[in-house]
Amino acid sequence: MKTTYVNATIVTMNEQNEVIENGYIIVENDQIIDVKSGKFANDFEVDEVIDMKGKWVLPGLVNTHTHVVMSLLRGIGDDMLLQPWLETRIWPLESQFTPQIAVASTELGLLEMVKSGTTSFSDMFNPIGVDQDAIMETVSRSGMRAAVSRTLFSFGTKDDEKKAIEEAEKYVKRYYNESGMLTTMVAPHSPYTCSTELLEECARIAVENQTMVHIHLSETEREVRDIEAQYGKRPVEYAASCGLFKRPTVIAHGVVLNDDERAFLAENDVRVAHNPNSNLKLGSGIANVKAMLEAGIKVGIATDSVASNNNLDMFEEMRIATLLQKGIHQDATALPVETALTLATKGAAEVIGMKQTGSLEIGKCADFITIDPSNKPHLQPADEVLSHLVYAASGKDISDVIINGKHVVWNGECKTLDEERIIFEASRYKRGLQR
């Protein structure tokens, strides 16, 4: 099946960050086979021609760190620091989850993400009360591209920890798929919730199965102080001593890093998922993304969970990310719009090991989203496309979402998930949680 999308303004995110006015994209099944400017001449003898009527077409956004199973917990525990927020609000509520609640919560997060333009994401879920196969089936049904990882903790007894490791290893062996729509990573929660033995076992599983690692690291000053007091090393050095960085690793946050640590992360192919809104809301601080990029670290933008954000709008994250860097460095050139867009598209895709997506180029997966600026005053005049995407647009502006060549959202309507049922069930299950 060959489909051509014509009369589009195409934000390619190729090496030149080329924006093609009045162009077209040809998709064959799940792959882009041509991207050009001008009028389509039907040289490829396509099956369908779709008129985009001047819409902006850009790569689907890539969210490098989420917790979609937590989506029911939006608005719970506002205005709290990370540790008490986790210990007194989030973990007690997650302990009440059932497989049905977990699926309903996941569906809500998936619906919000895909309708706001996210096509790929990397996720960590707490396995308590969760049917992991049901979660993976739910993500698959959404049509999204994802790395969904089972989180490991050292809570409970040593036998509990051993069982958690065994279950996580089975999960990795079942779901790791380097080139598929769904894959997974090895995901120890953090150095402050995992024992040294557990972190070492996670490193072993990652090496033996050739997977990536996903972990919260260097998120707060308290974490750095506590880990240094307990192990005599800062979190980066401690994680490295456990062997975690033997495989490409994504660290969520990286707020508290020094110059030596940034250089070390770059040398060891450790990537950073930058969560600006969540870090601000939890009072964790502001990650120095400018310094990370200058050190050669791969960085991708992320939302974290709705419980700490409180939405999954990647456009908002792009805007906050660039404004924060300009502010903390007192440098208006810090993190320009092209870089912000890169960190939410092709750069983010590279961070989570999904190089097959993130730009609109021949040979890439047909993952793209559209915005119609014609009826949106906040996107007018419409000629400064890149600027508007970062500084003016929001996820609410999305018209269409195509993932792997399939229309997942069309004219604002999600085709893969039942929006009315999902919203109803989310409210019903939320009321049943004992706060």
Curated annotation (Swiss-Prot):
Keywords: Hydrolase, Metal-binding, Zinc. Substrate binds at residues 94, 150, 189, 219, 304. The keyword DNA damage does not apply. Its cofactor is Zn(2+). Its EC number is 3.5.4.28, 3.5.4.31. The keyword Zinc applies. InterPro entries: Amidohydro-rel, Deaminase_MtaD/DadD, Metal-dep_hydrolase_composite, Metal_Hydrolase, MTA/SAH_deaminase. Coiled coil: none annotated. This is 5-methylthioadenosine/S-adenosylhomocysteine deaminase. It comes from Bacillus cereus (strain B4264). The lineage of its organism: Bacteria, Bacillati, Bacillota, Bacilli, Bacillales.
